[in-house]
UniProtKB/Swiss-Prot annotation:
Its cofactor is Mg(2+). GTP binds at residues 36-43, 63-67, 81-84, 148-151, 180-182. One of its GO terms (cellular component) is cytosol. Belongs to the TRAFAC class TrmE-Era-EngA-EngB-Septin-like GTPase superfamily. EngB GTPase family. SUPFAM superfamilies: P-loop containing nucleoside triphosphate hydrolases (SSF52540). It comes from Streptococcus uberis (strain ATCC BAA-854 / 0140J). This is Probable GTP-binding protein EngB. It holds the Pfam family MMR_HSR1. Mg(2+) binds at residues 43, 65. It comes from the Bacteria. The gene is engB. CDD domains: YihA_EngB.
Length: 199
């Protein structure tokens, strides 16, 4: 999609929630998946990019997203919010089910164009963060790393934290890396540019 202005980002809605591929939308609209740990800020990322307060529900309780949530944006693109990983209070059986559901979507969905992998700028990436990045690289799925909660760290320390994250992920320079804050509205244009480049 060459021009961002042809996309009315405010014309967005939750289309459906799916547990497996029999429930996926049947069309060829390109999709961008959003992956990250529970409470990394996926819902806030979606709401901020789409200029909506509560389109994706934010929750103080991690593990709230239990299905693949498909958000329709102007009938031209979809965001797919996948269950957050790394939430300790979810049973092993449930975590395994989520993992299978996410893997099935990421490896078999023709509509998928890229994955936004969200990490917390404040902390070193978790084992699950690293595994997700390695998984996407292995399957040659384009990845956009978004480091959230940049407002929680003084700007003078951003470079240090970015370097820490890139080193832990074994980050490849061809991938986009974006510092983001839904509070201070940092990184919105950069995120859209990286997403639309993949459509």
């Amino acid at each position: 999609m060459a021009e961002e202005q042809v996309l009315n980002t405010h014309n967005a809605s939750l289309l459906l929630s799916a547990a497996n591929k029999s429930h996926y939308p049947e069309d060829d609209i390109p999709e961008i998946a959003l992956a990250g740990r529970s409470n990394v800020g996926k819902s806030s990322f979606i709401n901020t990019l789409l200029g909506r307060k509560n389109l994706a529900r934010t929750s103080g309780k991690p593990g709230k997203t239990q299905l693949l949530n498909f958000f329709n944006i102007d009938d031209k693109i979809r965001f797919v919010d996948v269950p957050g990983y790394g939430y300790a209070k979810v049973s092993k059986v449930e975590r395994a089910r989520w993992g299978k559901m996410i893997e099935e979507y990421l490896t078999s969905r023709d509509n998928l164009r890229a994955v936004v992998s969200l990490v917390d700028l404040r902390h070193e990436p978790s084992t699950e963060d690293v595994q997700m990045y390695e998984f996407l690289k292995y399957y040659e799925i384009p990845v956009i790393v978004v480091a959230t909660k940049a407002d929680k760290i003084p700007r003078g320390k951003w470079n240090k934290h970015e370097s820490m994250i890139k080193k832990k992920l074994n980050f490849e320079q061809e991938d986009a890396f974006i510092l983001f804050s839904s509070v201070d509205r940092i990184g919105i244009d950069q995120a859209w540019d990286a997403i639309l480049e993949q459509i």
